[in-house]
Amino acid sequence: KRKHAYLLKGLTKTDKDNPWWYDEVIKHFDEIKDFFNTQPFAIVECKKQPGGGKLEDKKLKQHLADYGDLLIREIEILSPTMIVCAGGPIYDFAINKLYPQEELITIEGHQEMRLHTSTGTLIFFSYHPSDRKTSRDFYDSGVMYHYREFLEYQLKMKQ
């Protein structure tokens, strides 16, 4: 949960003037804990089962094929401004099934992120939070790296 909390706080606090690097985020742990426990957000998973370790991609892809319409409906109900996909199969599903391809923008050099133009929804590829990557790597080299690039892209588009 700590990785989720850091990421949630970073995504909501980062802007063109404040990049909220990992070292800054961890200084505010009590604030982050309160924020995480009181702010609305969703962690959408597919085929989540207790116990066990890893779910094979083949099984996950089959589950997405069988029940993807329910996941799409859940995301439509939530109408998020950001979707963080924990793993390749979920990201592939999101960018290929949620929105028409012609409405998605890829920022050059950032295949791990898409912008849905009509809703402004950002879709990110992320490591799964249970990945053995350190909290710092999970935070700085994943979603936050691409989000900062998106903010730069936004600034360029406004000029």
Language-model regions: role of each:
Residues 1-78, 82, 88-93, 131-132:
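A polyanion-binding, active-site-adjacent surface
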